[in-house]
Amino acid sequence: MKTKVIFAFISLLFLALSFSASAEHGLALYGEPKYPANFLHFDYANPQAPKGGTLTLATSYTASSFDKLNPFTVRGRPAPGLLELVFETLAVYSLDETMTQYGLLADDMQLAEDYSSIVFHINPRARFSNGDPVLASDVVYSFETLIGDKASPRFRSFFAKIAKASIVDNRTVRFDFKEANRELAFVVGALPVFSRKWGLDDKGAPLAFDQIVHQPPIASGPYTVEEADYGRGNLTYRLNPDYWGVDEPVRKGTHNFERINYKLFRDYDLQVEAFKAGVFDIMVEGKARNWCCVYKGVRFSEGEAIKKLFPHKNIPAMNGYIFNLRKERFQDVRVRRAFTLAFDFDWVNKNIFYEEYRQPYSYFSTTELAASGLPSEDELGLLEPWRDQLDPAVFGSMVDLPADKRNLRERLIEGQRLLEEAGWVYRDGALRNAKGEPFVLEASLTEGIPLPRIETYLRNLGQYGVIIKRRLTDQVSSRRDMQ
């Protein structure tokens, strides 16, 4: 017995020595977390908000039904809202910061100084919907289940760089990474956790994970499934009166509705009309034409329905035309500049987008990470050693695309000059290089993308003499092409 105790002590000592890091309540990929360790609630949450009532939602996608309550397997269509309302993760992102996580099921996190691993301590108050405590064994079970062959392959892909999960003690779990990478801490923080008791059969024996279909999840989230109407595509969640996290800082003031209903619609236009008729409560609109022209009528004029833009600081989804830089012709920045000049954003915005779009100036537009003005002193310190290899424009003011108010003809003239500098000259009916080879552009057009917006751009490129080859592809082929 004495030998075992000494061995255990040495093992714990080795673990402590090999993991030199301090416990953190939050992790920020950029800078420091906004909220201190003793924060009471997120700024955007209202702890005094009244509780009760019913919120009725529709999905952001079109579907007429769902057929399972397990969102982690391949077959079938999961019920909407499960991941957001029923399941919880080790950590949760704040909505007013860029890439910052705070402990949810975990009350502290220890990221190794060399970014090779992370340790989570599970909040002792955390409980599943059946009243069981959330333990390290549940975390490891969830991880191993999701990377197993009974779960969707997308989870194996998502956690591909996580080497293993191991139990340190009853409420402490460690994840080792396959490579030193601090971003993997955020990957692990997004691990959904569920009870191993979810999916037991009538005799208490566990079902294969892909056989868990209609059994209500046993998880730790604020809501549980109250009613699932698989035939009509209606679903009701009920706020768990014994929800463990109601007073946790990352949850306080949130999840205030007693019930949340989901209604499914097989057609987007039908969904829009249902919203206008008051069938459900919130509609997030992504089509410029609808935003401009559809949401009108008595309910709007009398204030019963409200149309409102909400500013945000999230990284926006990228929407644009992407150059394949593996093609030699696009490796010349002058060619890319000429192609950019041919895109008449103002015309497209006015005639197709109802002047509702804004031209981005950064991959991180609307966030604190977006570049602006001249490089800072710290940025210059990083850039100076590479000055001879960088475009001089890098050291100047940030390019402001909307500021270029020249008409299309003037921009095309400049674009033609840039192409000539790059060795592409118009002759014999096409844009050609010194070998006489034409500039052929293959445009991969994915099904579902409105063609007028891209046809206008392709027509402008044709004025340079670019030969356009259009290829219509489906979503699967398009993803394969990108790879």
Annotated model-derived regions:
Residues 23-114, 144, 151, 218-220:
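N-terminal lobe/hinge region of extracytoplasmic solute-binding protein
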Residues 26, 52-61, 107, 117-120, ...:
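Short, well-ordered beta-strand elements
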Residues 45-50, 72-79, 108-152, 168, ...:
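Aromatic- and charge-enriched surface segment that lines or borders ligand/interaction sites
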Residues 76, 82-97, 189-259, 266-270, ...:
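Gly/Pro-rich hinge or "lid" segments in bacterial periplasmic/extracellular proteins
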Residues 121, 156-203, 221-229, 373-389:
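Surface-exposed binding/hinge segments that line
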Residues 141-145, 158-161, 181-224, 250-257, ...:
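A short beta-strand/turn structural motif
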Residues 146, 164-166, 226-238, 263-327, ...:
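Extracellular/periplasmic solute-recognition and catalytic clefts
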Residues 238, 331-459:
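Append "and occasionally in soluble cytosolic enzymes with long acidic Gly/Pro-rich linkers
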